[in-house]
């Protein structure tokens, strides 16, 4: 399988604070990879570094074989346009949505490349096939939705671009267990024929049997990798 993501020797953080330490990670096309760990151990920082939203101290990141960004001297946001061009979609944790927009407007805002905007109606239909509860809510302001529905909109927005790598940051955070499992189940329906997915979670049990690999994360380092069926030994 082709490599979608190759992270090598990455150290990253916020200003002088280093959160990620000499981290290596390879994700191949068609893979679903779970990264599990407690809050504050670097899962979100890893996503932000890949997306160009925080500083690197050192290391390299290849997306589809192309170098993206280099050092902290570039500053956060300096190569995010390249990340978008290469096809990276980050689905942030929590309620990071535009409350004043309708569901339809919010979804369409995720079609930020010329090609995806041209095909936004088709992409939107694909999202609605996965998140069926949103079909009758297209003209409803996002701020009036339930927590589970808002999370569906947030993930759906990330699906609107022609992405090669999907990064979902704790998609079940703050949701009732039944709703969280439904959201996660829908997320896992995304076709990864020519793409890949990383899901960050605190609860390893949620990902067991649902992803190809589960990797533990502690103190900014990845450790304890196992197949999803053998992951009970991984400690958060």
Model segments located where?
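ABC-type ATPase nucleotide-binding domains, specifically the catalytic core motifs of the NBD
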Residues: 15, 55, 81, 103-122, ...
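ABC ATPase C-loop
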Residues: 158-159
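Catalytic Walker B motif of ABC-type/P-loop ATPase nucleotide-binding domains
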Residues: 166-169
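The feature captures the beta-strand-to-loop junction immediately N-terminal to the Walker
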Residues: 36-38
């Amino acid at each position: 399988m082709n490599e979608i993501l190759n992270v090598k020797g990455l150290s990253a953080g916020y200003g002088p604070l280093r959160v990620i330490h000499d981290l290596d990670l390879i994700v191949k096309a068609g893979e679903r990879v779970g990264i599990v760990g407690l809050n504050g151990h670097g899962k979100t920082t890893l996503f932000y570094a890949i997306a160009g939203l925080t500083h690197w101290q050192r290391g390299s990141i290849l997306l589809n074989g192309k170098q993206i960004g280099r050092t902290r001297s570039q500053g956060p946001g300096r190569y995010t346009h390249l990340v978008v061009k290469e096809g990276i979609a980050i689905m942030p944790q929590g309620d990071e949505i535009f409350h004043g927009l309708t569901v339809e407007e919010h979804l369409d805002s995720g079609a930020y490349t010329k090609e995806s905007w041209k095909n936004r109606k088709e992409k939107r239909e694909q999202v609605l096939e996965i998140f069926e509860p949103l079909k009758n809510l297209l003209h409803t302001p996002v701020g009036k939705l339930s927590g589970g529905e808002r999370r569906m909109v947030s993930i759906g927005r990330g699906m609107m671009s022609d992405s090669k790598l999907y990064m979902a940051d704790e998609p079940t955070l703050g949701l009732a267990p039944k709703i969280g499992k439904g959201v996660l189940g829908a997320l896992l329906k995304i076709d990864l024929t020519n793409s890949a997915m990383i899901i960050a979670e605190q609860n390893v049990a949620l990902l067991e049997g649902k992803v190809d690999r589960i990797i533990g994360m502690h103190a900014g380092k990845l450790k304890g990798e196992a197949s999803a069926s053998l992951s009970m030994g991984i400690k958060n």
